[in-house]
Amino acid sequence: MLGKFFECEANRNEKYYRVIQTIKEYSDGRRFPLNEIVVADNKVDLNATDRTKMGGFCISSYEYIFRWLIRGDTLCEVKIPEDTKIYKTVSDNGIYIADKIILTNPKKIDDDFAMELYRKSTLPEISYFKAMTACSICGYTNTAMKVCTDKVNKENVDIAITELEDFCKRRNDEKYINDPLAIESVKILYDRLKEIKEL
């Protein structure tokens, strides 16, 4: 029986994706190899009572991967090994979890590719605000501003500003935002949000 965070077992043969970091190592020194089986440190726990304890690797579908660009600089296709089950979680953001994955077909993310992912995305409104901020932090300024133009208005700008501030605070706490270009890109977005608020 599946726990409260899991909706169903998913089809292993569907197309899945994961954003990975290749320019620098993760904080734990890990690097993800390509075209070989990678095993999660913690197995999927179907009875987890806390989302952070679900285990496995989080992966997503193409229409939701825009939400996860903050995770790295490269988009990979994900194959699920024959002996591994994959589970769809109870989430509005298309999150799937598996114990083992194979990362293939890496593609570097830049502003143009981020824009493509945005145009093919189907996210809840609040997730667009998070993704917009993530794009700004990653230096995908054109994409961030396009999301802002398309998704932010006088009625929801306060929510967008709160999401940006909360997102950036978490990143600052994690010592993530230390790049002058990222700081400038976030400022451009923040100033635009304040302009919308003053309309």
Predicted regions and their residues:
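Extended amphipathic alpha-helical coiled-coil/heptad-repeat regions
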Residues: L164, I177-K197
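Charged, low-complexity interaction regions
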Residues: L123, T143, R171-P180
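Conserved positions within tetratricopeptide repeat
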Residues: M145-K146, I161, K187
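Short amphipathic alpha-helical heptad-repeat segments
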Residues: N153-L164
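ADP-ribose/NAD+-binding catalytic cleft of ART/PARP-like enzymes
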Residues: M1-M54, R67-D73, I80, T84, ...
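Active-site-proximal loop/hinge segments that shape catalytic or ion-binding/gating pockets
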Residues: S91-K154
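Long, contiguous interaction/recruitment modules in multidomain scaffold/adaptor proteins
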Residues: E63-D111
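Contiguous, structured surface segment used for ligand recognition
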Residues: G56-C58
